[in-house]
Amino acid sequence: MIIAIDGPAASGKGTLGKRLAHHYGYRHLDTGVIYRAVAYALMQSGHDLRDEAAAVAAALELDPEKFGDPALKTQKVGEGASIVSAIPRVREVLVNFQRQFAADPPGAVLDGRDIGTVICPHADVKIFVVADPKVRARRRTMEAKARGEAADEAAVLADIIQRDERDKNRPIAPLKPAPDAYLLDNSQLDIEGGVRAAIDIIEAVRAGRSRG
Protein backbone atom coordinates (compact mmCIF):
# COMPACT_ATOMS: atom_id res chain seq x y z
CA MET A 1 0.00 0.00 0.00
CA ILE A 2 1.18 3.51 -0.84
CA ILE A 3 0.00 6.39 1.32
CA ALA A 4 0.59 9.87 -0.13
CA ILE A 5 0.52 12.88 2.17
CA ASP A 6 0.78 16.37 0.71
CA GLY A 7 0.46 19.85 2.13
CA PRO A 8 2.13 23.24 2.51
CA ALA A 9 5.14 24.08 4.68
CA ALA A 10 4.74 23.50 8.43
CA SER A 11 1.31 21.88 8.03
CA GLY A 12 2.34 18.85 10.10
CA LYS A 13 2.53 16.40 7.21
CA GLY A 14 6.03 15.18 8.12
CA THR A 15 5.12 14.23 11.68
CA LEU A 16 1.90 12.66 10.42
CA GLY A 17 3.76 10.64 7.80
CA LYS A 18 6.26 9.35 10.34
CA ARG A 19 3.53 8.32 12.78
CA LEU A 20 1.44 6.59 10.11
CA ALA A 21 4.46 4.66 8.85
CA HIS A 22 5.16 3.46 12.39
CA HIS A 23 1.50 2.52 12.91
CA TYR A 24 1.30 0.40 9.75
CA GLY A 25 4.86 -0.90 9.73
CA TYR A 26 5.69 0.83 6.45
CA ARG A 27 8.79 2.75 5.40
CA HIS A 28 8.62 6.54 5.50
CA LEU A 29 10.13 9.12 3.19
CA ASP A 30 9.96 12.83 3.95
CA THR A 31 10.50 13.96 0.38
CA GLY A 32 11.11 17.53 1.50
CA VAL A 33 14.36 16.35 3.06
CA ILE A 34 15.63 15.43 -0.40
CA TYR A 35 15.24 18.99 -1.62
CA ARG A 36 16.62 20.35 1.64
CA ALA A 37 19.68 18.16 1.13
CA VAL A 38 20.22 19.60 -2.34
CA ALA A 39 19.82 23.16 -1.04
CA TYR A 40 22.19 22.48 1.85
CA ALA A 41 24.81 21.03 -0.50
CA LEU A 42 24.65 24.18 -2.64
CA MET A 43 24.93 26.41 0.41
CA GLN A 44 27.92 24.46 1.68
CA SER A 45 29.69 24.68 -1.68
CA GLY A 46 28.92 28.38 -2.10
CA HIS A 47 26.74 27.98 -5.20
CA ASP A 48 23.69 30.10 -5.92
CA LEU A 49 20.46 28.23 -5.15
CA ARG A 50 19.23 28.95 -8.68
CA ASP A 51 22.36 27.53 -10.34
CA GLU A 52 20.72 24.74 -12.35
CA ALA A 53 23.88 22.81 -13.24
CA ALA A 54 25.16 22.83 -9.66
CA ALA A 55 21.73 21.88 -8.29
CA VAL A 56 21.38 18.92 -10.69
CA ALA A 57 24.89 17.74 -9.79
CA ALA A 58 24.02 17.93 -6.08
CA ALA A 59 20.80 15.97 -6.71
CA LEU A 60 22.71 13.21 -8.49
CA GLU A 61 25.20 12.90 -5.63
CA LEU A 62 22.76 12.76 -2.71
CA ASP A 63 23.68 10.48 0.18
CA PRO A 64 20.56 9.09 1.95
CA GLU A 65 22.70 8.45 5.03
CA LYS A 66 22.83 12.22 5.56
CA PHE A 67 19.07 12.81 5.41
CA GLY A 68 18.97 12.82 9.21
CA ASP A 69 21.43 15.72 9.55
CA PRO A 70 19.86 18.31 11.94
CA ALA A 71 21.26 21.09 9.73
CA LEU A 72 18.65 20.20 7.11
CA LYS A 73 15.85 21.24 9.49
CA THR A 74 16.81 24.91 9.77
CA GLN A 75 14.51 27.60 8.40
CA LYS A 76 17.19 28.91 6.03
CA VAL A 77 17.65 25.49 4.41
CA GLY A 78 13.87 25.13 4.17
CA GLU A 79 13.64 28.40 2.27
CA GLY A 80 16.41 27.17 -0.03
CA ALA A 81 14.59 23.89 -0.64
CA SER A 82 11.53 25.76 -1.91
CA ILE A 83 13.75 27.58 -4.45
CA VAL A 84 15.61 24.43 -5.54
CA SER A 85 12.40 22.42 -5.95
CA ALA A 86 11.21 24.86 -8.60
CA ILE A 87 14.07 23.83 -10.93
CA PRO A 88 12.56 21.32 -13.43
CA ARG A 89 15.73 19.28 -14.02
CA VAL A 90 16.29 18.83 -10.29
CA ARG A 91 12.75 17.53 -9.94
CA GLU A 92 13.30 15.09 -12.82
CA VAL A 93 16.38 13.64 -11.14
CA LEU A 94 14.62 13.15 -7.81
CA VAL A 95 11.26 11.84 -9.04
CA ASN A 96 12.78 8.46 -9.92
CA PHE A 97 14.26 7.99 -6.46
CA GLN A 98 10.91 8.70 -4.83
CA ARG A 99 8.97 6.35 -7.11
CA GLN A 100 11.40 3.49 -6.51
CA PHE A 101 11.10 4.03 -2.76
CA ALA A 102 7.30 3.90 -2.99
CA ALA A 103 7.29 0.74 -5.11
CA ASP A 104 9.22 -1.45 -2.67
CA PRO A 105 6.97 -3.78 -0.60
CA PRO A 106 5.24 -4.08 1.81
CA GLY A 107 4.22 -0.42 1.71
CA ALA A 108 5.38 3.15 2.07
CA VAL A 109 4.26 6.52 3.36
CA LEU A 110 5.60 9.50 1.43
CA ASP A 111 4.98 13.09 2.39
CA GLY A 112 5.70 16.17 0.32
CA ARG A 113 3.96 18.62 -1.97
CA ASP A 114 3.31 16.60 -5.14
CA ILE A 115 3.15 12.97 -4.02
CA GLY A 116 -0.51 12.40 -4.87
CA THR A 117 -0.43 14.47 -8.06
CA VAL A 118 2.95 13.67 -9.65
CA ILE A 119 5.11 11.14 -7.79
CA CYS A 120 2.45 8.54 -6.94
CA PRO A 121 -0.76 9.51 -8.77
CA HIS A 122 -2.04 5.95 -8.26
CA ALA A 123 -1.38 5.89 -4.49
CA ASP A 124 -3.90 3.82 -2.53
CA VAL A 125 -4.69 6.69 -0.16
CA LYS A 126 -4.07 10.40 -0.70
CA ILE A 127 -4.33 12.90 2.14
CA PHE A 128 -3.88 16.66 1.73
CA VAL A 129 -3.04 18.33 5.03
CA VAL A 130 -3.89 21.98 5.60
CA ALA A 131 -3.68 24.36 8.56
CA ASP A 132 -4.14 28.08 9.09
CA PRO A 133 -0.91 29.97 8.23
CA LYS A 134 -0.85 31.62 11.68
CA VAL A 135 -1.08 28.22 13.37
CA ARG A 136 1.70 26.88 11.15
CA ALA A 137 3.90 29.90 11.93
CA ARG A 138 3.37 29.41 15.66
CA ARG A 139 4.29 25.72 15.43
CA ARG A 140 7.36 26.39 13.28
CA THR A 141 8.54 29.12 15.70
CA MET A 142 8.16 26.78 18.67
CA GLU A 143 10.10 24.06 16.84
CA ALA A 144 12.93 26.48 16.06
CA LYS A 145 13.14 27.70 19.64
CA ALA A 146 13.16 24.10 20.88
CA ARG A 147 16.27 23.58 18.75
CA GLY A 148 17.85 26.65 20.33
CA GLU A 149 17.40 28.84 17.25
CA ALA A 150 16.24 32.45 17.34
CA ALA A 151 12.88 32.79 15.58
CA ASP A 152 10.46 35.68 15.10
CA GLU A 153 6.89 34.49 14.59
CA ALA A 154 5.96 37.41 12.32
CA ALA A 155 8.96 36.73 10.08
CA VAL A 156 8.17 33.01 10.02
CA LEU A 157 4.56 33.79 9.03
CA ALA A 158 5.73 36.06 6.21
CA ASP A 159 8.05 33.31 4.95
CA ILE A 160 5.28 30.69 5.09
CA ILE A 161 2.92 32.90 3.09
CA GLN A 162 5.67 33.58 0.53
CA ARG A 163 6.50 29.87 0.24
CA ASP A 164 2.83 28.99 -0.18
CA GLU A 165 2.56 31.39 -3.12
CA ARG A 166 5.78 30.11 -4.69
CA ASP A 167 4.77 26.46 -4.27
CA LYS A 168 1.24 26.99 -5.60
CA ASN A 169 2.35 28.98 -8.63
CA ARG A 170 5.47 27.14 -9.77
CA PRO A 171 5.15 25.89 -13.38
CA ILE A 172 6.17 22.31 -12.56
CA ALA A 173 4.14 20.25 -10.06
CA PRO A 174 2.41 23.12 -8.26
CA LEU A 175 1.12 22.51 -4.74
CA LYS A 176 -2.52 21.42 -5.00
CA PRO A 177 -4.63 18.51 -3.75
CA ALA A 178 -5.20 15.58 -6.09
CA PRO A 179 -8.85 15.32 -7.22
CA ASP A 180 -9.26 12.15 -5.14
CA ALA A 181 -7.36 13.36 -2.06
CA TYR A 182 -8.96 13.54 1.37
CA LEU A 183 -8.63 16.97 3.00
CA LEU A 184 -7.38 16.96 6.60
CA ASP A 185 -7.45 20.34 8.38
CA ASN A 186 -5.36 20.05 11.53
CA SER A 187 -5.51 23.73 12.56
CA GLN A 188 -7.34 22.73 15.74
CA LEU A 189 -5.89 19.24 16.14
CA ASP A 190 -2.91 18.14 18.19
CA ILE A 191 -0.57 15.46 16.83
CA GLU A 192 -2.62 12.58 18.22
CA GLY A 193 -5.84 14.03 16.83
CA GLY A 194 -4.31 14.42 13.39
CA VAL A 195 -2.99 10.85 13.42
CA ARG A 196 -6.38 9.47 14.48
CA ALA A 197 -8.14 11.43 11.73
CA ALA A 198 -5.70 10.11 9.12
CA ILE A 199 -6.04 6.51 10.32
CA ASP A 200 -9.83 6.85 10.11
CA ILE A 201 -9.48 7.95 6.47
CA ILE A 202 -7.10 5.10 5.62
CA GLU A 203 -9.22 2.46 7.32
CA ALA A 204 -12.36 3.73 5.57
CA VAL A 205 -10.60 3.40 2.21
CA ARG A 206 -9.35 -0.11 3.04
CA ALA A 207 -12.80 -1.19 4.24
CA GLY A 208 -14.40 0.14 1.06
CA ARG A 209 -11.95 -1.79 -1.11
CA SER A 210 -12.40 -5.02 0.83
CA ARG A 211 -16.17 -4.75 0.38
CA GLY A 212 -15.70 -4.06 -3.33
From Swiss-Prot:
Q: Which domain of life is it from?
A: Bacteria
Organism (species)? Bradyrhizobium diazoefficiens (strain JCM 10833 / BCRC 13528 / IAM 13628 / NBRC 14792 / USDA 110)
Residue stretches in coiled coil? none
Return the InterPro entries for the record.
Answer: Cytidylate_kin, Cytidylate_kinase_dom, P-loop_NTPase
> Recorded GO terms, molecular function?
(d)CMP kinase activity; ATP binding; CMP kinase activity; dCMP kinase activity
| Protein family | Belongs to the cytidylate kinase family. Type 1 subfamily.
Give the UniProt record's GO annotations in the biological process aspect.
Answer: nucleobase-containing small molecule interconversion; pyrimidine nucleotide metabolic process
Q: Which CDD domains match?
A: CMPK (cd02020)
Report residues binding ATP: 7-15
What name does UniProt use for this protein? Cytidylate kinase
Q: Which reaction does it catalyse?
A: CMP + ATP = CDP + ADP; dCMP + ATP = dCDP + ADP
Q: Does the keyword Cell membrane apply?
A: no
Q: What class of enzyme is it?
A: transferase
List locations, semicolon-separated: Cytoplasm
Which HAMAP family does its entry note?
Answer: Cytidyl_kinase_type1
